[in-house]
């Protein structure tokens, strides 16, 4: 019997609670997560070349659909590059995860 990983439980939880749109910047630290999202039929994902673009796309997604998007990136500098986009969401009171 293959047991589910914590990240699989987390992604399933998000999808079950209508957080089904993901904005991704791939990297070594999140390859298993991206792979799992890619295998989920219920999930929609968009890949970006820069973390700030992914965060701003999540902001635009909320503005146009009213649904909160999920931004995923790799650790280290990748996470740091999210700050401008996340701060923009915070200043505009736009929810993002």
Predicted regions and their residues:
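N-terminal alpha/beta PP-like core and its mobile active-site loop of ThDP/TPP-dependent enzymes
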Residues: 1-97
């Amino acid at each position: 019997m293959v047991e589910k990983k914590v990240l699989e439980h987390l992604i399933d939880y998000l999808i079950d609670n209508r957080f089904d749109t993901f904005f991704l910047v791939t990297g070594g630290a999140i390859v298993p997560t991206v792979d799992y999202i890619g295998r989920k039929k219920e999930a929609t994902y968009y890949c970006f070349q820069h973390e700030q673009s992914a965060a701003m796309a999540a902001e635009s997604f909320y503005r146009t659909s009213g649904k909160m998007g999920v931004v995923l990136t790799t650790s280290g500098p990748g996470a740091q590059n999210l700050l401008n986009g996340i701060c923009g969401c915070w200043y505009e009171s736009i929810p993002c995860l």
